[in-house]
């Protein structure tokens, strides 16, 4: 029988990772303005996300501008958007599939083997979801690093990692860990050998041997 505690732990971790991926996708702080130069004025903070760019003044006023043109966006941003949305949708599917296969649920109690397969299948989908989120955040982060160390990039146009990017990395890790625990909650099949049956001994001959 599947380990109910391991299943529940994996599901909770993966679910938290899915929530984190939604938060990361919605937040505009994927990259924040770098203050590496001493000549940069710190009266305002500039940051960008997947859907908008914002400017926060020292007075507390925040102004955001949504990216209107899809074709005007660079390929990295478009790919990151697509991978994050795919990861969120896959995570939603994994939640429904894994819920059916959980030991604590009453669904499919008459078919224990099918119930375990559903839990493992949900874990596999969580793994794919976490991988998509990890690729998206790593790709976007690599682009930030390349632009930061590019000598052609002006000092006043360099960005660093934002909070949303760290949340995305944490979300991907939780989805991968939770999916792996769900997959490991399925017990290994034990090979059963047939019980040997005793053969009847031949009855002793009562007749005499003749030459």
UniProtKB/Swiss-Prot annotation:
InterPro entries: Claudin, Claudin1, Claudin_CS, PMP22/EMP/MP20/Claudin. Residues 1-7, 103-118, 185-211 are cytoplasmic. It holds the Pfam family PMP22_Claudin. The chain crosses the membrane at residues 8-28, 82-102, 119-139, 164-184. Residues 210-211 are annotated as: Interactions with TJP1, TJP2, TJP3 and PATJ. GO terms for biological process: bicellular tight junction assembly; calcium-independent cell-cell adhesion via plasma membrane cell-adhesion molecules; cell adhesion; cell junction maintenance; establishment of skin barrier; positive regulation of cell migration; positive regulation of epithelial cell proliferation involved in wound healing; positive regulation of wound healing. GO terms for cellular component: apical plasma membrane; basolateral plasma membrane; bicellular tight junction; lateral plasma membrane; plasma membrane; protein-containing complex. Can form homo- and heteropolymers with other CLDN. Homopolymers interact with CLDN3, but not CLDN2, homopolymers. Interacts with MPDZ and PATJ. Interacts with OCLN, CD81, CLDN4, CLDN6 and CLDN9. It is a multi-pass membrane protein. GO terms for molecular function: identical protein binding; structural molecule activity; virus receptor activity. Keywords: Cell junction, Cell membrane, Disulfide bond, Membrane, Tight junction, Transmembrane, Transmembrane helix. It is found in: Cell junction, Tight junction; Cell membrane; Basolateral cell membrane. Its main location: other. Residues 192-211 are annotated as: Disordered. Signal peptide: none annotated. Belongs to the claudin family. Residues 29-81, 140-163 are extracellular. Claudins function as major constituents of the tight junction complexes that regulate the permeability of epithelia. While some claudin family members play essential roles in the formation of impermeable barriers, others mediate the permeability to ions and small molecules. Often, several claudin family members are coexpressed and interact with each other, and this determines the overall permeability. CLDN1 is required to prevent the paracellular diffusion of small molecules through tight junctions in the epidermis and is required for the normal barrier function of the skin. This is Claudin-1. Disulfide bonds join 54-64.
């Amino acid at each position: 029988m599947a380990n109910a505690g391991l299943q529940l732990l994996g599901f909770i971790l993966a679910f938290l990772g899915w929530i984190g991926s939604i938060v990361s996708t919605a937040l505009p702080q994927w990259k924040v303005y770098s203050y590496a130069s001493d000549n940069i004025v710190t009266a305002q903070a500039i940051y960008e996300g997947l859907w908008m760019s914002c400017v926060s003044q020292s007075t507390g006023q925040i102004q955001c501008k949504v990216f209107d043109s899809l074709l005007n966006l660079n390929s990295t941003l478009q790919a990151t958007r697509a991978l994050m949305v795919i990861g969120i949708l896959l995570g939603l599917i994994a939640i429904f599939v894994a819920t059916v296969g959980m030991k604590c649920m009453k669904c499919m109690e008459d078919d224990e083997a099918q119930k375990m397969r559903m839990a493992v299948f949900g874990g596999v989908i969580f793994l794919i979801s976490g991988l998509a989120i990890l690729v998206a955040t790593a790709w976007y982060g690599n682009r930030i690093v390349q632009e930061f160390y590019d000598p052609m990039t002006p000092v006043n146009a360099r960005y660093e990692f934002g909070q949303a990017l760290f949340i995305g990395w944490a979300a991907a890790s939780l989805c991968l860990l939770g999916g792996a625990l769900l997959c490991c909650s399925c017990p290994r099949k034990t090979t059963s050998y047939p019980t040997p049956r005793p053969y009847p001994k031949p009855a002793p001959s009562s007749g005499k041997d003749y030459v």
